[in-house]
Each structure stands twice: as structure tokens, then as C-alpha cells.
């Protein structure tokens, strides 16, 4: 089992995460809340560094984050986990940023 994957964010997924953090900042008017959200998502994704091998054989490569409020779609390569999309769990489909 491999435990040292690199984590790479696709630009679309990264932009969607930033947009959600901006939305949270706009709604809350509190920079700390928006930063905490952004850092919490990044921290959860960083766990794929050592857990990605578990997902390698699964057909659906998505994980819920922050108590299921958000979903991240990813691919597992030989040495890298590619974060390819990010969305709110309320959204039916992945969309463009």
C-alpha cells in the first residue's frame, strides 16, 4: 500500500474552492470564517496523501467533506492524487466555475 501521494489541484477545482470561500466571506463578513473554511477543506484533502490507495479500485472517486456539505472528485495516479472538481453537496451536478 502506498502512503505518500502528491496532491495536485486542477485549476477548475481550486477556483471553485476559492469562489466558495469568497461567498462565505461575503455572507459572513468575517475573514476568519472564510479562511477557516478554506483551510479545513485543504486539510481534509491533504489526508488523501496517505489514504488515496484505498480509493484506487473504487469506481466512484468522490469524498464528502465537512460533514457531507461539500464533495471533492479526484483521480488516483501512480504517484499523484489529482483533485479535479469541488462542489456543494446540494448541487446535483458539477458545474463550471
Q: What are the language-model segments listed below?
A:
Residues 1-38:
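Arg/Lys-rich, positively charged N-terminal/basic patches that mediate binding to nucleic acids
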Residues 36, 54-56, 76-78:
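Juxtamembrane/interface motifs at transmembrane-helix termini
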Residues 15-18, 53, 57-64, 92-97:
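Charged, low-complexity, helix/coiled-coil-prone segments
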Residues 39-67:
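A short, surface-exposed loop/turn module that caps and links secondary-structure elements
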Residues 67-97:
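Enriched for short, Lys/Arg-rich terminal
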Residues 13, 41, 74:
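GIY-YIG nuclease signature motif recognition
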Residues 16-22, 29-32, 43, 47, ...:
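Catalytic cores of transferase enzymes with a strong primary signal for eukaryotic protein kinases
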Amino acid at each position: 500500500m502506498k502512503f505518500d501521494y502528491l496532491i495536485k489541484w486542477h485549476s477548475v477545482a481550486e477556483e471553485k474552492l476559492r469562489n466558495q470561500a469568497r461567498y462565505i466571506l461575503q455572507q459572513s463578513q468575517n475573514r476568519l470564517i472564510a479562511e477557516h473554511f478554506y483551510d479545513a477543506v485543504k486539510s481534509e484533502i491533504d489526508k488523501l496523501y496517505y489514504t488515496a490507495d484505498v480509493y484506487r479500485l473504487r469506481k466512484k472517486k468522490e469524498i464528502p467533506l465537512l460533514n457531507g456539505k461539500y464533495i471533492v472528485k479526484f483521480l488516483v495516479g501512480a504517484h499523484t492524487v489529482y483533485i479535479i472538481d469541488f462542489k456543494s453537496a446540494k448541487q446535483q451536478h458539477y458545474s463550471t466555475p
